[in-house]
């Protein structure tokens, strides 16, 4: 995700600036202050040699100018809040400014995808699609853009054609790396292959399909909402009006952050501690009711109260209906067939025998982190 953020910005500056922006040598990227800190850190490092200036600020206060050619947003943002960027995107486009969005891929099973509210580039990590944390990495990114920009996408693009017998066959459709064309025209020379991780994430989507992903995302969201309601009963305030899986919690005046941290450490629970004194909690598909009980025990203990989890977690939506996804996704046949372990393993074996795999290098393979 961190690498993709700058790749998206570079794509926007390459052949995608208006004539007025090129004449003004527009080189500024606006970055919302609530982007993930690790993403901003990588962008800051990589922007310098690319001649790109980063301006960090509040997206609601952003005013487009001729020198700004792209904007980068987080959806949901670093605090966990789901923001309505529709008006912002319209304002940016009116000034010939492209909009790139770092998105949580699993949240998009429930939330309106950025492409539907006008984003030009959408990127992020595919780690949530069945990839363990691996102590922080590696994981493959996903990168999507409009069809108009396909020739400025970094990396190689695999397409489907027909062989001499009229059968479907995969081939390299676009070859924009420096191995194939002049270096000055190349869009990428990155070669840190994450093909295995991308393949694993892809099979996760194949196994679960659209309905399975909706159920997983719905369970995560319902658990986060239940936790928020129970915390409010203990006197805490949840600051995110709309959210998917992450809460930003304001502590009551009589609750000490240090006391909360000590209890959390005793319970071997990691929380996010903001400089202003708030606490962040994120839920994922591995979170069990017992984990919620432990979290509520921690917050209750810090508040000097007792708590016992004695009810099930109901399925419920806690964000505004305007954010709800209404469009279908993963409608191809492959996402509807292989929903048992046996079916999936047989499918993987068939693909391996056709060499649509990483076992041999006879089939076209991008072998590129940016094209996975």
Show where each model-derived region lies.
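Single conserved hydrophobic/aromatic residue that forms the stacking wall/gate
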Residues: 1-13, 361-371
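Conserved PLP-enzyme active-site core in the AAT-like
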Residues: 15-169, 231, 244, 248-249, ...
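Flexible, glycine/charged-enriched surface loops at secondary-structure junctions
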Residues: 54-57, 212-217, 231-242, 272-275, ...
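Active-site C-terminal subdomain of aminotransferase-like
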Residues: 129-230, 234, 239-241
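Conserved PLP-binding catalytic core of the aspartate aminotransferase-like
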Residues: 221, 234-264, 283-287, 367
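Flexible, glycine-rich loop/tail regions that form catalytic "lids" or insertion modules at the edges
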Residues: 221-228, 251, 261, 317, ...
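Noncatalytic alpha-helical scaffolds and linker/capping helices
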Residues: 278-288, 295-297
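Flexible inter-domain linker/hinge segments
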Residues: 291-360
